[in-house]
């Protein structure tokens, strides 16, 4: 019998959620996603030392200012890891903008353009890159600008329907609604486990997927942040799913039928008028889980970015 991973691939584009090139090569995903936490983790892998050294060398050639060198090294390290990953995936790499720019549209656009230039200078074309931005109002506006410049974006840390709707209305290429982190919040609040079919994260992504397909939005839905393979299998049929190596391993070892749960209806329902800033903030604010998890996610990515910078500063 074929494995669940093999069956899932027939229904959904499988993406690897890791910066570990060895793990990516093992599971042959279409794309890969990274974030500040995963870049920090990757930077601690011994085999990646030459990438860090090359990034430091680049930064020193750009500036004599230590703080600027740290910034440039971190950016180039993310790009260098991305370049290595692109040698083993046929599709795209997602590289994230500094989380500390999550409420700064202009700063996010500038950083995204800089990352794209670094990739382009290395011979990597835009159609192989997704720029990751937090799904704040400012991040969504940055994505709207970048998409018009031919820079496709992956809007991450997405927890509320308001965020999903605003992303679709801005014409962003792809969203990453978080499944496991939503479930974490409800599990802590209600003190119980959830069956995969009633998992609040699964329910959230299913609702977003159906809304997009019913209204004919082209934005790709890529479920992310999974805690178990039950959540993944409940979203079989989703456009894409980004999965950590340990869960890819579980899927590869599991057999049994994988049933398509999400189906594209190719709908053409009338779309509502685009949300205003005030409407977005109000609707998002009605979801306590989303407010808490978005803020926490940004803080945690910023902490890991700081750790990476400290690690780099010690090497300069």
Curated annotation (Swiss-Prot):
KW Transmembrane helix (keyword) present: no
Q: What CDD domains has UniProt attached to this entry? A: Transaldolase_TalAB
What does UniProt list as catalytic? Answer: 132
Q: What's the EC number here?
A: 2.2.1.2
Q: Which UniProt keywords apply?
A: Cytoplasm, Pentose shunt, Schiff base, Transferase
Q: Which SUPFAM superfamilies match?
A: Aldolase
Question: Briefly, what is this protein's role?
Answer: Transaldolase is important for the balance of metabolites in the pentose-phosphate pathway.
Q: Which protein is depicted?
A: Transaldolase
